[in-house]
Amino acid sequence: MMNPLIIKLGGVLLDSEEALERLFTALVNYRESHQRPLVIVHGGGCVVDELMKGLNLPVKKKDGLRVTPADQIGIITGALAGTANKTLLAWAKKHHIASVGLFLGDGDSVNVTQLDEALGHVGLAQPGSPKLINMLLENGFLPVVSSIGVTDDGQLMNVNADQAATALAATLGADLILLSDVSGILDGKGQRIAEMTASKAEQLIDQGIITDGMIVKVNAALDAARALGRPVDIASWRHAEQLPALFNGTPIGTRILA
């Protein structure tokens, strides 16, 4: 089996039928012309935000990471492992892709511990066991994995989806693409940066050009590139016509170098 490709989905993608249609069309085209196994990892911040708003619950973030109190982890699990995950499975079904919905704890695929008590039920993801997902891939299934994990003592944890995808890529020896709303990392003039190193990233963070959630994304990609010993791509799902090329290894966004 070729080494898998993990496609991490994020941003408002889950809110846009047009974007999902384009993405799954690109996935079908890619699967028809390539034997390479694919895995989807997703967050779903927009789904969670909508639900929290509907329930009049405050959304708090610290350093770009969502604060998850004990009384909210059930709601967030329902949104991510439930609504967001099953929405993607429904799209896969519509496009005749045999898929399986998972969370990080299934088959101990990703090991999770609490990241920081101040963040509540927010988990740190570490590589786990490849056995379950490899079995699914060998049988032609598309695993769709939500970024909810569970600790050894049975506590549910909300994990940053970029970090979850990184840990799963390390588990499977997979290549990683982080798909988001933006076409990559932009410089101070709004131009896409084709390649990024750790020192360049630090410089742009110090200058205030890379901020908030993008800092988390860049750090996750740098961590992934280091852990995997290979480049990681950050790109946009908006350019659907370019996605098959991206899945095939052609950079269309920002390539993060270890």
From Swiss-Prot:
One Pfam family of this chain: AA_kinase
CDD domains named in the record: AAK_NAGK-NC
Subcellular location: Cytoplasm
Binding annotation for ATP: D181, V182, S183, G184, I185, L186, I209, I210, T211
Keyword line: Amino-acid biosynthesis, Arginine biosynthesis, ATP-binding, Cytoplasm, Kinase, Nucleotide-binding, Transferase
Keyword ATP-binding: yes
Residues where substrate binds: G44, G45, R66, N158
Molecular function terms from GO: acetylglutamate kinase activity; ATP binding
Site positions for Transition state stabilizer: K8, K217
Annotated pathway: Amino-acid biosynthesis; L-arginine biosynthesis; N(2)-acetyl-L-ornithine from L-glutamate: step 2/4
GO cellular component: cytoplasm
One GO biological process term: arginine biosynthetic process via ornithine
PANTHER family: N-ACETYLGLUTAMATE SYNTHASE (PTHR23342), N-ACETYLGLUTAMATE SYNTHASE, MITOCHONDRIAL (PTHR23342:SF0)
Protein name as catalogued: Acetylglutamate kinase
